[in-house]
Amino acid sequence: MYKQDFPEGKEALNLEIRLGNKLVRFRKFTGKEKIYLPIQRHTDKVIKLIDKDSPPLEGDAVITNLKNVEIGVRTADCVPIILLGKEWVGAVHAGWRGLKKGIIAKTLKALKEEGEDDITALVFPSAKGCCYEVGKEFKEFFRRNLKERNGKLFFDPQREAVEQLRENGIKSILVWEKCTICSPELPSYRRDKTKERMLTSVVILF
């Protein structure tokens, strides 16, 4: 399942999607939000949050079944992914290193170990193949989603993330096909070397 009729322009910077008792948000990160955010290091570590008072840990994905506890990840070109199960939810920061290390598969495995076998994935804007120039070494890391143009190599991490979701049995996937690099309203480290980030988060409501 795909959905691409997401808002454009400034409206895209304050998006909320309610799915049942779950609320997903995509907005500019201010640093004042009361949200559980992992210490992101481009790893394949998945944090299972079972205590709302737990301090931030190093990792690039979080899963939880706690009610009214918002979890999220920060991105500015990497792929932000929200995973929705019946009782558990997850937030994933998938840069090219995380995609190479299998962060998506490991997060899905953690959710399935908690009994989640019907998961919906929401994939939000990231750098895409139109703009994301990479080195030739990427041919060693990824066998697909690479294109050469004018002697340069480009990689599409969002498409790679979607294909990894499919390979791990996820059939319900909503994709916001937007490139952060060529969308000036969205923060892009590659374009601006900015410290700004987008915050993609999810909360299970009572």
From Swiss-Prot:
Q: Which key words are in the record? A: Copper, Hydrolase, Metal-binding, Oxidoreductase, Transferase, Zinc
- Catalytic activity, as annotated: adenosine + phosphate = alpha-D-ribose 1-phosphate + adenine; S-methyl-5'-thioadenosine + phosphate = 5-(methylsulfanyl)-alpha-D-ribose 1-phosphate + adenine; inosine + phosphate = alpha-D-ribose 1-phosphate + hypoxanthine; adenosine + H2O + H(+) = inosine + NH4(+)
Q: Per its UniProt record, what InterPro entries does this chain match?
A: Cu_polyphenol_OxRdtase (IPR003730), Cu_polyphenol_OxRdtase_sf (IPR038371), Cytotoxic_necrot_fac-like_cat (IPR011324)
Keyword Metal-binding on entry: yes
Extract the SUPFAM superfamilies matched here: CNF1/YfiH-like putative cysteine hydrolases
A Pfam match is: Cu-oxidase_4
- Per UniProt, Zn(2+) binds at 42, 78, 93
Family according to the record: Belongs to the purine nucleoside phosphorylase YfiH/LACC1 family.
Q: How does it assemble?
A: Homodimer.
What is the protein's name according to its record? Purine nucleoside phosphorylase aq_167
